[in-house]
Each structure stands twice: as structure tokens, then as C-alpha cells.
Amino acid sequence: MTVPPISERASFEVAKRLLCQILNEGLVSGTLETFESEEPYLCLFRNSCNTEKPEKCIRVRLQPSAQAGIFMRSARIVSLVRPEMLQMPVTLVDGTSERRELRSGALFQFASSLFTEHVEASTLEEIALGLENSEANTEKWLELHSSPGPLDLNSPSVLWERALIWGHPTHPFHRLCYAQEGLAPVEPRDLPEFLTPTLAFVSVLRDEISISGPFEESLQPLLAQLDVPAPETADRVVVPCLRLQLPCVFRHFPSAVLVKTVSGCADTQASMRTLTLRPELNFPYHIKLSIACQITSDVRAIRPCQTLGGQLVRKQLHEFFPPDLWWFKEVASVAGNQTAQGDTQENEDKARHIGCILREDLEARANANNEALIIAGSLAQQPANDPRTHAEIVFGLETVEQKHDWLKEYVAGFLRAVLPSLVQYGIGMEAHGQNALVRVCRDTRKITGFVVRDFEGIKVHVPTLEKLGINLCMTSPGCTKNLEDIWSKIHHSIFQNHLGNLVYALGLDRHDGWTIIRDELFAALKPDTDPRAKELYDFILQDTMPFKCFLRMRMSEHFNDYDGDEQDQPRVKRDERPLPNALLMGSARWEKVLNECAPKKLES
């Protein structure tokens, strides 16, 4: 098979995510078409279209085996469609005119003309520019990783972080990177500076920052190794930041003075803002730093409240984790102190520009056990030069039976690691593919356990803990009285994102992959013996699942701006759409669920 040029591959990575997203969000309708002896096509058209042959539509070819995983009722697709199911070409049809198109901006402009809902032209233009940015950055990622060295169980963890070359598996902004006000524009050519960044050490007045934990003591060995001078006076603290972030630091922290910059001492992890220090420095922590860039869906500067989740876990919640679950302890942090002058949005926006978190590095612990640490999301992705996933390559998965056995082992261990805390204590960990790592024995290639990190997204059901005599302040990060909101986030991050990505990447959505997950879910929860577990089990396997609507969030300016609690009344789910629950695929209920999701009546 001929491999398309890098530019076409990059364009299609955005295009296939975009086309699936507008269909799954209900912005357009879809059906399957077949032309003569060709493979079937996905056809997207206006929701109001009531003819079998729409005059204006988008056609994209399906992968040969994808049709078995797409389900229709009343000539309309009602099930989830994934980017893995699509292949080139993409054709835009308008009456008798047809043209092929991969460029994301032009494709979105045509696609948005199919929307029946009104969206401001300026918003559509912003989305188109974001798609073009993601496309350009994807091309640069492919250029830098066109001939990657093979990864194996002896590869350091940071190289596995770099294996996520495709970014988010379903988000159309999967490689978006926008500098915010105060920073110079970020271009694709700047990507190497993100991957191997220059560290800047600044001295700031102690009164301008808020310190949690033994920050100065923990950082001191690194400062000594890098010959970073100590502060001249006791009223100052040296804080690391990214060189790219310096304009924002100087703008919002008037006392900040650059002490030293150091290059070639660290590599970024998948998040693009957390650093793994080079092994010769023997520094036992990762450093998570603010960067005033929108990466995928959010600006990655660290708000003061986002340092609190790790503190909450370190001080209290870790006691309720299963004993064999490892977690990256956030030992100390720094944030701006502007919020002490008033907890306003303006002050918080200033304070986030100097955020820094020191997080335990567990690679030495894993090496002592002869274990590899692999970021979970990388296993579902492919190298740029190989059609197989990393899971297939590293674990030697060649047959459906081998994939079944491996997936059972993986899912069983993972659910045992993350669900007990949710059932017993109401603690929901956002363990999607970027926030979870897999421990693998180098000798046997067996999965020995899991690791979780990044607790700014942790959710805690306060009433559950109160019943156990554990009191938390309702203003603590992630605390809520709405248990179903936690379950909804778990459904998205664990089942749709983490495990779902593996099922689709391995091609097991058509070969009992979801049956394996249902079976292991039952084994992990034991819903027949525990009423609390049964409630969660029934929620996870309800008829529909809450699908995250990234584009609708952007259109309603609801882009990751909801971090508060949902105390007494459920919020309007503007960012979610119910779809047939993929976990039910292949079950006795599946056909009934599809029938109930059939379009009731087309708009005129």
C-alpha cells in the first residue's frame, strides 16, 4: 500500500477527527453509501434533509472492516463512529459539483454549511483556524518522528511519553498549540523547543508567591547540580519556569529576576508542560510548569486551585487507594499569590503564570522491580512508520485470541486499580490514557500494575466520605454532592477514552472487545453482592453514554470552564450528548438500545 505524503497524512488526521465529531455531536446526520464495487462510504448531510440522496454532503471512505461496527436505524447512523474507521479520500458534494478536500479549514467551512443550528461566523472562523493550527503542528510532529527508533520494555518512560505523536485520539484540536496574550506566537518550527525545553530559573519575592510543601528543600539539589545561584536575601525564592513562559512571568510578577537559563537538561512528557529531568542529574521529581498556551482544549497554565488536588491526595485521599495502585505524589508546589488580594478571576489569571509542581518520579522504583513504566495512551497509538499499535508490537499480539487474552489481563488489572476507591469512598480518578501508566515486567511481559497521576481532575463525593466519618471542606478541589457527575466523568475518561481507545485500536470492537470489558467490570465490582457497586455498574451499563461534545463546547464558549461543584441541582449538559452505550455492543440489549435511538421524525 502506498503511504501518502506527510502533509496529506497530517491533514487527514484532523479531517477524520472532525468528521466523526460533527456526526457524533449531532451537528449533522450520517448514513452509509456503496458505489458499485467500492468499499462503503460514510455520507454526512444536514439534519433537516429528508431525501435518500442529499444534494449537498460530505463523503469519506470507510476502512474495509469498519462497516460492521457502524449501526443504522431509519437509514441514519445512530452509533458512535470513530476516526479509526475512516480512510481517504474525502469528497465534498454540492449538486453536480464534486471535489476532494483534506485541508481542515476548507473542510470545516463546507461542513459548517450543513449545520442547522446557528453559530456565530466569528466562532466558526476561530474553529477553522484552530483546525488549521492542529494540522500544521501534526505535520511537524510527523516530520520529527518519521523514522522513530523502536520502543521496547527497556525504553525509558519519557520515550514512551513521546510515542503519543498523534495526540488526543478523537479531538479535532488534537495538536493545537496557541500562544496566549503575552507570549510570542507559537509556530510548528518551535516544536523542538517544546520537546526539549530550556529551563529558566527566576528569583521572586516570597510575598508574591504561595508555597505548599517542602518546595525549596526539594528543589535545592537540582539548583546545586545546575549551578543556579541561591537567592541573595531570605525574602526571595528561586522558581523554575519554561523559557518560553518568561514574558508572562515578568508581566505578572514585577519582582521576578532571571537568574539562569539551562538547556539540554530535561524532556517534556505527553502533556507538553511536565518535564522529566535527564538521568545524570539524579533528580527524584518531575517538574510540572505553567505554559500560557492553549494545548488541545485548555490553556496549560497552572491555576492555584489546581495545585490543591495533589495536596488533598497527599494528605488524605491516598489512604483510600488500593494498596497495589501506585500514584505520583505531588510533594510541593508554587503558585502566584495574587488570589490573596481577592479571589477574583483576574487575580487567578495572573497567579497561574508561575505555577510549578514537584511530582515524584517513580522510574527508579519501577527499575528496582525490573518493570517498565509505559504511558497507557501510547499502547493504543501507532508509530509513524508502522500500521501496528505499540501494544501489538511490544506484547506480540498477532491474532484475535492473543489480543483477547492481553485485553482481559489489562482490563482486569486496571479496573481493580481504579474502581474500589470510587465504589467505597466516592473518589473518582481521571485515569484517561494520558493520566495513567502501565507497569510491565521486563522478563515476562506481564502487566504488574498501574500508576495514576495529575490529580487536578480528581472528583470526590463528600457525602460518601462523611458517612465514613471523614470530613472535607466543600470548597476543596473536586468536591461535590453530585455522585452521578463523578460517574459520568469516569465513564468518559476510563471507558470511552482509556479502554475504548484500546478496543478500537486493536480492532476488537468487532471481536468481543466490549464483552471482555463488561465481564471484567462485573468481576471487579461484584454488583450482585454490593448495593453501591450495583448502582455504579448499572450506571456504566445504562442504555446511553454521555459523549463529550468538544465542538459544541467551543461554540457555546463552554470550553473547559466548568471546574466548580454541582451541589444540589444538575447542570445543563451542554457539553454532552447521549449516544448508544458502546459498552453494550454485542450484548442482548444492544439491538433494543439501537431501536430506541432511531430518529423519531426528520425535520422538514
Swiss-Prot record:
Keyword Ligase annotated: yes
EC number: 6.-.-.-
Annotated pathway: Secondary metabolite biosynthesis
Highest taxon listed in the record's lineage: Eukaryota
InterPro entries xrefs: Aerobactin_biosyn_IucA/IucC_N, IucA/IucC-like_C, LucA/IucC-like
Sorted UniProt keywords: Ligase
Catalytic activity entry: cyclo(L-arginyl-(Z)-dehydro-4-O-homoseryl-tyrosyl) + citrate + ATP = NK13650 B + AMP + diphosphate + H(+)
Pfam family, one: FhuF
GO biological process: siderophore biosynthetic process
GO molecular function: acid-amino acid ligase activity
Keyword Ligase annotated: yes
EC primary class: ligase
Function comment: NRPS-independent siderophore synthetase-like protein; part of the ank cluster that mediates the biosynthesis of NK13650 C, a highly modified cyclo-arginine-tyrosine dipeptide. AnkE is responsible of the production of NK13650 B via ligation of citrate to the ankD product. Within the pathway, the cyclodipeptide synthase ankA acts as the scaffold-generating enzyme and is responsible for formation of the cyclo-Arg-Tyr diketopiperazine (cRY) from L-Arg and L-Tyr. The ankA product cRY is desaturated by the cytochrome P450 monooxygenase ankB to yield a dehydro-cyclodipeptide intermediate.
PANTHER family referenced in this protein's UniProt entry, alphabetically: L-2,3-DIAMINOPROPANOATE--CITRATE LIGASE
Protein name in UniProt: NRPS-independent siderophore synthetase-like protein ankE
Gene: ankE
